[in-house]
Swiss-Prot record:
Keywords: Cell membrane, Electron transport, Heme, Iron, Membrane, Metal-binding, Transmembrane, Transmembrane helix, Transport. It comes from Rhizobium leguminosarum bv. viciae. It comes from the Bacteria. GO terms for biological process: respiratory electron transport chain. Belongs to the HupC/HyaC/HydC family. The gene is hupC. GO terms for molecular function: electron transfer activity; heme binding; iron ion binding. This is Probable Ni/Fe-hydrogenase B-type cytochrome subunit. It holds the Pfam family Ni_hydr_CYTB. It is found in: Cell membrane. B-type cytochrome involved in electron transfer from hydrogenase to oxygen. Gene3D superfamilies: Transmembrane di-heme cytochromes, Chain C. Its main location: membrane. It is a multi-pass membrane protein.
Length: 239
């Protein structure tokens, strides 16, 4: 939805004049964003060392439990991510329209693809002026769904499936996620895909940070501060 199509509304939902500042991201969305960022950073660091362990240290295991702590932190961060992902899905149903943008792409909409192409031109410096959107514009919405939402769900499912190997067949993890082994009977395959999923998300994170900084500067609308205050500020008005 572009800024031209969005009117401020009062408490009764009546149309009012267009504003330069629009409340976009509700508090639960912002809290989830930063907890999710912390969880992903923790999972990426600990997951890397789980896949590429540190050199063995001689001595009793009880005195050299570093890898055990790394695994524990990884499992704890994974469960934190999963809990808040469930809460985030819930908020997509009860929150405002912007709260559900990352969970779907309107593939059926010709207008979506037309504006998607315009944004591709803007990001590749082929278009001089961007359109202003209150929420996500079509290109980030498309990218977040394919390179973040779906991979995040995949990582949660495969992560709990791998955890169930140690928890045992009588665990709730195996009861809910044991079916993954019917798709990939070889546990190493799941480890490999889980590892590759991490890199997909990390590539997305790097692009996400670059685009957020770029848009804050070039498109003259607040991006980074919006995920702190919830308000999107348009620094100049389109005629």
């Amino acid at each position: 939805m572009t800024i031209h199509e969005t009117l401020a509304a009062d408490a009764h939902g009546e149309k009012a004049i267009e504003r330069q500042s629009v409340y976009v991201y509700e508090a639960p969305v912002r809290i989830w964003h930063w907890i999710n960022a912390f969880s992903i950073l923790t999972l990426a660091l600990t997951g890397y060392f789980i896949g590429s362990p540190l050199p063995s240290v001689p001595g009793e295991a009880s005195a050299n439990f570093l890898m055990g702590y790394i695994r524990f932190i990884h499992f704890a961060a994974g469960q934190l991510l999963a809990v808040f992902l469930i809460l985030r899905v819930y908020w997509a149903f009860v929150g405002n329209v912007h709260a559900r943008q990352i969970f779907y792409v309107p593939f059926w909409s010709g207008r979506f693809w037309k504006e998607w192409l315009h944004e591709v031109g803007w990001y590749t410096f082929l278009v001089r002026q961007p359109k202003k959107y209150v929420g996500h514009n079509p290109l980030p919405q498309f990218t977040m769904f394919l390179m973040f939402t779906l991979p995040l769900l995949f990582m949660a499912i495969t992560g709990f499936a791998l955890y169930s190997e140690g928890a045992g067949r009588d665990s709730w993890e195996y009861s809910l996620f044991g079916w993954v082994f019917s798709i990939w009977p070889n546990s190493q395959d799941i480890h490999t895909y889980h590892h590759l999923g991490m890199w997909v998300i990390l590539v997305f994170v790097m692009v996400h940070i670059y685009v957020a900084v770029r848009e804050d500067i070039m498109s003259r609308q607040s991006i980074i501060s919006s995920m702190i205050s919830g308000e999107r500020l348009f620094k100049d008005r389109e005629d």
